[in-house]
C-alpha cells in the first residue's frame, strides 16, 4: 500500500517561510533528498512520488502539499488518499507544534487536534484522528504575542541557522516511521 506523507501549511510566497509551514518545508526537504519534482494533482494538491528502500521491501511514498489554506487541507488530502487507495493507517501528517520547543520532534498516532486547524480539517474529512503525526516543535511566543500571529511569522535569525538541521531530522523521522515503525521511531527521535 502507498504511504501518503502530508505537509501542512498555507499556499503562497508570503507564507512559505513561516513557522506554520514547517511541515511543508520537511516535504520539500524529502523531495530534494529523493530528487523528485512536484506536480499538480486533480485533488488540488502538489505531489511527488518515490520508492523508499530497495527491491520487494521498497515502500511507495507520495509526498503531498495542499494547494488550499491550512483549515481546508482535509478535503484535498482525502481525495488524494482515495485516488491512491490509502487509508489513515498509512498517512503521515507533518505539522507545526507550539507546545514543543523549537527543533524538537515528536511522533504519535492519533490524538486530539490541540487547536490546530489543519489537524481539525484532516480529522473531520477522514472521520478519524488515527493517522500518524510528526509534531515539529516551533515553541511558544515570548511575552504577550498572540500565538496566531506567531505561527504566521518567519523563524528568528537564530532559528534560521538551525532550520536546515531541523528539516533534515524531520525527513529522517518520516523515513524511519515508514521503514522501522512507530516504536523504533519514537525511541530514536522523540525529544
Q: Which residues does each predicted region cover?
A:
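Nucleotide and nucleotide-moiety/phosphate-recognizing core
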Residues: 1-110, 119-134, 141-146, 153, ...
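Short glycine/threonine-rich catalytic loop with a Thr-x-Gly-x-Asp
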Residues: 112-114
Amino acid at each position: 500500500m502507498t504511504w501518503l506523507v502530508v505537509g501542512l501549511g498555507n499556499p503562497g510566497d508570503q507564507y512559505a517561510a513561516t513557522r506554520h509551514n514547517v511541515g511543508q518545508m520537511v516535504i520539500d526537504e524529502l523531495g530534494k533528498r529523493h530528487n523528485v519534482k512536484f506536480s499538480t494533482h486533480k485533488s488540488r494538491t502538489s505531489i511527488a512520488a518515490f520508492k523508499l528502500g530497495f527491491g520487494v521491501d521498497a515502500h511507495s511514498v507520495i509526498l503531498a502539499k495542499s494547494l488550499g489554506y491550512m483549515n481546508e487541507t482535509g478535503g484535498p488530502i482525502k481525495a488524494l488518499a482515495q485516488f491512491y487507495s490509502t487509508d489513515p493507517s498509512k498517512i503521515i501528517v507533518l505539522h507545526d507544534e507550539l507546545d514543543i520547543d523549537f527543533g524538537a520532534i515528536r511522533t504519535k498516532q492519533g490524538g486530539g487536534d490541540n487547536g490546530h486547524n489543519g489537524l481539525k480539517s484532516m480529522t473531520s474529512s477522514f472521520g478519524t484522528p488515527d493517522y500518524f503525526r510528526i509534531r515539529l516543535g516551533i515553541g511558544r511566543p515570548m511575552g504577550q504575542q498572540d500565538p496566531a500571529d506567531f505561527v504566521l511569522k518567519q523563524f528568528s535569525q537564530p532559528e534560521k541557522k538551525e532550520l536546515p538541521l531541523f528539516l533534515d531530522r524531520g525527513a529522517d523521522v518520516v523515513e524511519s516511521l515508514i521503514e522501522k515503525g512507530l516504536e523504533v521511531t519514537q525511541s530514536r527521535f522523540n525529544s
